[in-house]
Each structure stands twice: as structure tokens, then as C-alpha cells.
């Protein structure tokens, strides 16, 4: 792709680094921004910079937050003894949109994937196990995607919990194998949480 402007080329190159954005889409987005008032572009730049500089991870669940505790963990009406284990913030948002879950979350920050060089130590598994051992959790709900990596991560955590009295369950398989949680419709996902099954049963299916 030939550019008549180095500034335009640089902006397109940076925009195309975003996931799912190719050069042509990046060019379209950059040209759109150029047509907008300068104030709007400045506000976008400011919002992104503030996000990058000030965003935090919740001290309790590792969800993305503006404060030390996210709004969910800080809400006294939530059931802190029930913890839903998810991969990332997108899964938290998907489950929250169902309105069917009133417990806390634990965001792992990914899934175990040896092919990608991601092992248990790269995830927030250790703090989760420590909370269980401290007696702060009664039930863990595994809500990772129905993929090989998701199942591997679930099983690894389950094995780490052997010897504890913790109840472990997993969302019902209304989510198709290979699907990411964020793409499930709200009704299906809500039912999967409500109709969750003991984790041991899921290993037999």
C-alpha cells in the first residue's frame, strides 16, 4: 500500500497493530478520524492515554478496575463465598449481562497453553488457591471456554484443590465446544450458570 504522507502511513501502521484490523480497515478508520473535529480526536487520544496510565487490576479478583477493588468486589450485596473463574474481563462482562449471577469472580488472565508458552505461573492461579486454603471460598464455578486449553486449565486448578472441602462446579454445556464465552448469547449463558453441574460429572461426559 503506497501512501502520499508519512504521517498517514505511520497512523495506519499503528492502527493495524490492533487485533482484527488489517491495513485497509486501518486506513478507513484513520481517514474517518481525519474528517472529525480536532477536539474529538484529542478526546479519543486522551481517553486511551488515561486508560493506559491509570487502569488497575482489582486486588481481590484481578478484574480491570479504576480503584483498588472493582465495583463487583466492593458491592456488599454480592456473595463473596461463590467465585466464578474466568479467562478475562470480556467473560466477566458477558456473565454480568445475563443478570443471573450474584457471586464474585476470579480473572485468570488467560488459559494454560503450552503451545503459546503460557503455563500456570503466568496466570493468577496461585492467589485463587490461596483464597481457597484460607477458607474464604465455598464454591468455585469454572466458566472457561469449551476449548482444549480451557479444559486443561479447569483440570489443573481442580487437581490443585484436592484435599480441600471446596465445592467445584462448571457451567452446563449449553456453550458449544470450541466457543469462547463472550460469544454466547445471554439466555444460553445465563442458563449454563444456573444449571451448572459438579465438575467431577463434567469429566465423565
From Swiss-Prot:
A Pfam family of this chain: Toprim_4
Domain Toprim: 81-176
Zinc finger (C4-type) boundaries: 58-73
Keywords for the protein's UniProt record, in alphabetical order: DNA damage, DNA recombination, DNA repair, Metal-binding, Zinc, Zinc-finger
GO biological process, one term: DNA recombination
InterPro entries listed in its UniProt record: DNA_Rcmb_RecR, Rcmb_RecR, Rcmb_RecR_Znf, TOPRIM_dom, TOPRIM_RecR
GO molecular function, one term: DNA binding
NCBIfam families: recR
Similarity comment: family membership: Belongs to the RecR family.
Role according to the record: May play a role in DNA repair. It seems to be involved in an RecBC-independent recombinational process of DNA repair. It may act with RecF and RecO.
HAMAP family from the UniProt entry: RecR
UniProt-recorded name of the protein: Recombination protein RecR
The organism of origin for this protein: Christiangramia forsetii (strain DSM 17595 / CGMCC 1.15422 / KT0803) (Gramella forsetii)
Name of encoding gene: recR
Amino acid at each position: 500500500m503506497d501512501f502520499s504522507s508519512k504521517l498517514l502511513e505511520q497512523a495506519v501502521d499503528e492502527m493495524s497493530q490492533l487485533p482484527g484490523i488489517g491495513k485497509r480497515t486501518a486506513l478507513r478508520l484513520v481517514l474517518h478520524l481525519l474528517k472529525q473535529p480536532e477536539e474529538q480526536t484529542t478526546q479519543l487520544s486522551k481517553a486511551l492515554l488515561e486508560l493506559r496510565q491509570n487502569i488497575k487490576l482489582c486486588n481481590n479478583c484481578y478484574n480491570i478496575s479504576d480503584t483498588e477493588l472493582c465495583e463487583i468486589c466492593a458491592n456488599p450485596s454480592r456473595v463473596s463465598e461463590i467465585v466464578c473463574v474466568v479467562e478475562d474481563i470480556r467473560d466477566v462482562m458477558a456473565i454480568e449481562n445475563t443478570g443471573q449471577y450474584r457471586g464474585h469472580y476470579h480473572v485468570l488472565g488467560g488459559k494454560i497453553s503450552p503451545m503459546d508458552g503460557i503455563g500456570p505461573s503466568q496466570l493468577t492461579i496461585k492467589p485463587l488457591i490461596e483464597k481457597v486454603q484460607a477458607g474464604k471460598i465455598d464454591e468455585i464455578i469454572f466458566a472457561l471456554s469449551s476449548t482444549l486449553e480451557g479444559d486443561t486449565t479447569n483440570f489443573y486448578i481442580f487437581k490443585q484443590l484436592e484435599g480441600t472441602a471446596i465445592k467445584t462446579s462448571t457451567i452446563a454445556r449449553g456453550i458449544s465446544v470450541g466457543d469462547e464465552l463472550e460469544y454466547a448469547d445471554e439466555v444460553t449463558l445465563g442458563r449454563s450458570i444456573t444449571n451448572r453441574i459438579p465438575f467431577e460429572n463434567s469429566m465423565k461426559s
